[in-house]
Every structure is written in C-alpha cells, then in structure tokens.
C-alpha cells in the first residue's frame, strides 16, 4: 500500500488486495482451529481472551477493508483510499495481536504471567513440528499470495487485450 501511494502503480494495489485476501483466509482458519483447540483445552470454544478477541477484531478490520474497496467504483480512488486504510490498519493489528495480549491476563502462554513456551513447557517430540510450522505457514501464505497476485495480473492483462 505504501508503494502504491508512492508510485501509483496498479500492481502494488493488486498485491495489497491479494495479501489481504490471503490474510483473511488464514484468519478464518486460525479462528476456526483456535476455537477447536480452546474447546478442548479450556472447555469452551470462545473464552473471553484478549488474543482471541484481538484476532476476531483484526479479521473484522480486514473484512471492512474489502467492504470499503467494493463500495468504491472508480479504480484510482478505490486504490488510494484502500491503501490509506491498509496503512493505518496494520499498526492497529500489531497492537491487537501482540501488545495488548501481553499486557493483560490471558489464557495463552506468555501473557499476563503465564509462562511462555520455554524448555520445560514443550515436549521434545513437539519441537520439530512447531518449528517447521513457524517456518512453513508463512512460506505457504507467501506462496498463495503470490499465486493469487499472478492470477490477478493475468486477468487484468486479459481485460486490457479484449475489446
């Protein structure tokens, strides 16, 4: 979004929208699997936890981004307003997901006095899977985002060629 505002190149707007689309998909999967995990671990699918609430609010903020984009007809105006929204939304997401949960009591590890995943907290059998997931999921997200971006570019070029 910053690159779009600096250059006005439509490719950067397309990358921003596909990053948001990919992020929302991962948000929904994260919320759904988190609810399953919470139900097993804490006995209810949605305990009043700052990290869960922050994740839901973050998802809603990016859904609002999509609503905003779809409400505007003119392409340049849509891209500019969406870029500004995206730039302001990102730091709020960081606060919602990382800063506030650390400052308040939470059921999640590392929050409100709960221990983090330290040497004694995670079994050695779980560590390889955990670290592989920490590397793999962002790589999968980047790959999906780049695929969606390339498809969007091809669709745009096809529209330019067709009368």
Predicted regions and their residues:
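Polytopic transmembrane helical bundles with strong interfacial aromatic enrichment
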Residues: 1-163
